[in-house]
Every structure is written in C-alpha cells, then in structure tokens.
C-alpha cells in the first residue's frame, strides 16, 4: 500500500468518524492530555537533555516530578500556536502524523506486548488483527503497510520507543534534518498576583528551519515544596515564521502558593521532550510573584477584669446614747391614814418599775 492510498484510507476513516461524532483530528488535544496524565501518574523522572541548565538559585530537583493535583484546576488547555504574520492557526503536517501520534499514544504499549509475546509475525494484518476494535485494526494496518511488516515490528522492540519517534520511523511524521527555532520573548501576566489567581504564559518565537512534530513543555516550579507542574502541548510542525503560543496556569488558594517568586520555564522540542530521540530547539525562563495581603490580627480580649466597686452603707450607724436616769428624789412618805391607801400606792409603784 503506497502512502497516497493510505492517506485516502485515513481520510475515509476520518469522514466516517466525523459522521459518528468522533473527531479524529482532535488527536492533538487527546494526545496531549493522555500523555500528560500518563507521565504524571507514572511519576517518572522527566529526562531532559544534559545541556539544559537551570539556574542554581532556583534549587530545582528534576527527580521530584509531580503534577499538583490542585492542577486538576489547571485545565489542560491546548492553545494552538498562531502565526504572527497571518494570524491563522498553524495546521502543518500530514493527516498520517496526527493519526499516528494519537493511535500510538493509546496502543504503543499493546503493540510492544504483542510483538514481545508472539515474536516475528509475517504480516501486518496478523499483528494488527490482535487489536480489539475495527478502526484501530485499520489504522494499524495502514501504518504497518507504509514501511512493511519487517520494519514495522522492529520499531516496537527499539529501546525506549515513544509515539513521536515511532511515527517518524514509520514515516508518518516528517523528520527535518536541521530544525531550529529562536525564542523572542516569554511573558507572564499578571506579573504579581495572589494565590488562586490565573497567570497567562505567553511565548513568542521564530522558526528558522522547518520542524517536525514535537512538544512545548510548560514547567512551573514550586519553590516551597521543591516540586513542579508540567504541561505538554503537542505541535505537528512549523514552517519558518514568527509564532506565539499561550498557556493559562491557575494557582490554588492554599499553602502551595505562599508569598514568593515562581520560575516558569518553557522548552520547545522536536519529538518528545526529555527522551533520547528528541532535539531541544530552545528554552527560556520567566517568573511570576505571589503576594498575598498580610492578614489583620484579630484583637484578643483581655483577661483583666474591671474592679467592681464595693457598695458603702449609706445608712449611718446609729450611735447608742445612754439616756440619763433620773434618780427620784426621796420625798417623805406621808403617814397613811388608813391601810387601804397604803396597798394602792405599793401596787402603783411596782407597775411603774416593770414598764
């Protein structure tokens, strides 16, 4: 099967999928999301070329690769690169490259397992027939026919094979000899924000020599925890010209983003960044700053109590004064004239004393 016939088959499959509400050209987005999730879930070290230098002041450890789960808030937006000259979205590369990358992003481990277990298989239809779905079998067979079964199965026993390199070996993706790009500027806006803010990372670059399919890697370093967030954006290829690519990075309002400066590094790679088969086209670093307002301290109630006034007895204490007792003057007792009058006088005196 020649390449033009394979392109026709893929075009028919694409039309069929579009009719079934399945957009095969969304391979760029799907590949990027799947690849990012796969790398983060495996929590593997990202292997950048040794010539990439990180400023020692950032104290970054590449071995601590994590996708901050608050970055589920970081939607994996695939902002396509735009040509600064025409303003049109870049759509380079043959349909074979997009389909191949999307297909192998899902089925490369399966094909590696099939070929490892069954050994040399004499036909493309037998290798691909071990897949489960008709569409995948057709795409696999078409890719296999591009290079022939003898070359096809050997690709999947190559050490550290990845979808980009496999698609280049299959000839579905172009392999320019001297891809080159210059970075013009990298901006982050706003330059200063609070935790929970969204920051727009905007890269402007110039492609000097045509590139093949590759990736942008947007890396935000969390200096507090010595970890990082990585987002990959796939591109099919660029012809010479000026372009820009953007990525929205959303922070979270928690202890990850304390006050301080956060480095943002962008890599552009021909192929899959960090692998032995990729070419680093360029890199640059910028920063944004988190500046949260200082919380106003809440006044603490004092433990000292207001003294309670002691009530004073306003009623004066009566002063006891002795009432002088008059001593009755003894008067001569008249001589009773009769006994009855004497009794009456004695009784009256007794009563007066008892009162």
Swiss-Prot record:
Biased composition (Low complexity): 69-83, 301-342
Biased composition (Basic residues): 345-355
Region of interest (Disordered), ranges: 63-83, 290-355
Cysteine disulfide partners in this protein: 97-173, 100-167, 128-140
GO CC terms: extracellular region
PROSITE patterns for the chain: SAP_B
Primary location class: secreted
Signal sequence extent: 1-27
Organism superkingdom: Eukaryota
Glycosylation sites: 132, 209, 242, 253-254, 282, 303
Keyword Secreted among record annotations: yes
Keywords: Disulfide bond, Glycoprotein, Secreted, Signal
Location(s) in or outside the cell: Secreted
Occurrences of domain Saposin B-type (ranges): 93-177
Family: Belongs to the countin family.
Entry-linked PANTHER family: MYND-TYPE DOMAIN-CONTAINING PROTEIN, NF-KAPPA-B-REPRESSING FACTOR-RELATED
Name recorded for this polypeptide: Countin-like protein
Origin species: Dictyostelium discoideum (Social amoeba)
